[in-house]
Amino acid sequence: LNLLRFKTNRNIKFRGFVFSSVGDNFNNFYYNNLPFTLTDAQKRVMKEIRKDLGSGKQMNRLLQGDVGSGKTLVALMSMLIAIDNGYQACIMAPTEILANQHYQTIGKLLEGIDIKIRLLTGSSKKSSRKLISESLLHSSLNILIGTHALLEENVQFANLGLVIIDEQHLFGVAQRARLWQKNLNPPHILVMTATPIPRTLAMTLYGDLDVSVIDELPPGRVPIKTMHFTDSERNKVFGFIRNQIAEHRQV
């Protein structure tokens, strides 16, 4: 009951930007660049997100799905909706490797579409940081992808409409709040995790978040196996890793 009361109070307190429609960028991507037909689970989640974005209340949604389920694609389409409505978007990842992966993946997906994206991490050069700051303030940068570097005071957006946080459990509520404060009005928030969380537990851990689940893999995707080994099986693990790499797979 306390969680439901908190959720009701949050909806009353925080008004959100209204993204009333999709535009050229979304449609161009959907009809020309979409790498595969969306799964029913992705379509369902997109409907939930679009409903949030058009509700007039701030979206605070947890998107849960296995590695390879298509969370990044859903996140990208959500960002395109924000951009089509005149706003900027950002993705914050816990490591430079993951931020770089998002940057490369999204850049490839957006080939041929006039969307400006940049990468900002702790190792970004001073000249690059200055260019990014200027581009953000002049609204010439649509999507910023990065690590905790996004929280720095000199990173200011002209019109931040959507914040996406990957691997939510590695960030605290205070860090989410710091991204809110980049705007006079709070942006919409979408947080993602590949960690399976039962819905009742998610309500306990993330009572301020609505929950969406992608429970279906895109066609042709091989299910990801999660395995546990004890320390005494270390050599077995190393041998398994070597074999997988030799077969050009990921571990």
Where do the language-model regions lie?
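Interdomain "pre-motor" coupling segment immediately N-terminal to P-loop NTPase/helicase cores
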Residues: L1-N28, N32, L76
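Inter-lobe coupling/hinge segments of SF2-like helicase ATPases
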Residues: K13-R15, T37, A41-K47, G54-V251
